[in-house]
UniProtKB/Swiss-Prot annotation:
GO terms under cellular component: cytoplasm; membrane
Protein family (similarity comment): Belongs to the thioester dehydratase family. FabZ subfamily.
Annotated active site: H51
Class of enzymatic activity (EC top level): lyase
Name this protein carries in UniProt: 3-hydroxyacyl-[acyl-carrier-protein] dehydratase FabZ
Name of the gene: fabZ
CDD domains given in the database record: FabZ (cd01288)
Length: 145
């Protein structure tokens, strides 16, 4: 897959930094409409130290955060939103279907379905090897940083 935005370019779009930046690269992008990101899940992730030491599973809340960050890339890379921040304002219909473990490549897909003023909504799914790991509906609030 071709890289549209690499790790350093993502850091120019969203304000997240290590250890909380959860997208490694963007492979598909339509400004304000859609974004597909990838996260290589490593056994060295700090959250695996406690979740769980003998049975490493990526916390579901971090999968949803990775999806929210992917949606933020779709919304914040426009000229009108440059320098702004996307806050996670809500999550609905969230379901976890597959565990995400070290060695997995997490594909993060977000489609923005509605933007009204500073509020955006989107549908999101995370997959591993084509299998659904998580799906949800996200709500974002855009504001000045």
């Amino acid at each position: 897959m071709e890289t549209i935005f690499d790790y350093n370019q993502i850091k120019q779009i969203i304000p997240h930094r290590q250890p909380f930046l959860l997208i490694d690269r963007v492979v598909e992008y339509e400004e304000g409409k859609r974004c597909v990101g990838l996260k290589q899940v490593s056994g060295n992730e700090p959250f695996f130290q406690g979740h769980f030491p003998d049975y490493a599973v990526m916390p579901g809340v971090l999968i949803t955060e990775a999806l929210a960050q992917t949606g933020a890339v779709a919304m914040l890379n426009s000229e009108e939103n440059k320098g702004k921040i996307a806050l996670f304002a809500g999550i609905d219909k969230c379901r976890f279907k597959k565990q995400v473990t070290p060695g997995d490549t997490l594909m993060l897909e977000v489609e923005i379905t509605k933007i009204k003023g500073p509020i955006g909504k989107g549908t999101a799914k995370a997959t591993v090897d084509g299998q659904l790991a998580c799906s949800c509906e996200l709500t974002f609030a855009i504001q000045n940083a």
